[in-house]
């Protein structure tokens, strides 16, 4: 249910380290490229702005609005408008190098966090609600709270926290001395910018209801489970599922594939994928993923000798050098194809041409790949964790509980058995393609959260 409408047009400011299509390395950028635009469309009186760094590699040419000196360094702010959203880019010398992320990111995003609100002041931007995303925005959330602004902080992945020795880093933050205690930004002798966001936000969200529960436990809480449990008891932590950009990922209009609108139409995409990689007529089990421990890609690697009995296996990804080398070695097998790195047109062809999609994640805050796979009628084989629990119904996909190669193999066998029954497989695929994972629902929930905060007093930090 929507909260009572705020009495005047809301001004919402999202703050994040990346935003598609201007800067992107992963799912965070995808969220910031989609959610604000949907919010602006759903509530046309709401002013939606996104603030992110002005990287040297930024894909776009913002119009400079302001240039001055803040904290002893030259600072500038630029603007682009797209899809009803105002995108602001904060320029600092620390971000004038190739790429997005670097080993000194804690210091860089402290500079960003200190300069953000003063730079906005200089251009007359005063939000009603500031919505920070992940640790890179944690310090901005803390400074916004100290100004009395209403704040939301979204955890997209708790594993990455933005930590640095507190004695060295305290001077980078611009925070008052009292903020450096255990109830503030201190974490085992370190500055922790994720904890800054958690501690100072009026409300904290994660990107799925199950992940919101998981991170209150020692297994998934990354040392912050005590704080997150307290936030839960205070009613200040909730999970809101991410959505999917259904224009960007649409099998009916996708320019990278032979378009189709129902499961029967996948046959052409499947034939194209097998031909591209020189595979036989066995069904295709695919993975498009970072090659990382979190994603369970070592489990997929260990399971390969069993999987290739039933499946062609196609993997697209990069990351861990050892896993990359191992998958490269397996690519000589006639039923295994491996493409290193990330290639979006190829990813589209894989999502469309595969029959099943493996996500053996050890943890998965929300997950985007399973949403894309189902949109294309490709059935997920997933471990029961985080957003995979919330998004993959038993009637569609194949789920397993233990993070082992054996459990993945068994679930894949169940998927293969279902594939042998075309009527069952087509019914599952049709249901998958009918599921609504658009951003409209999540966008409404965030807008309702903002409205509720504007009608309440600040909680105690």
Where are these regions (language model features)?
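Catalytic cores of nucleotide-sugar-dependent glycosyltransferases that transfer UDP/GDP/TDP-activated
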Residues: 2-461
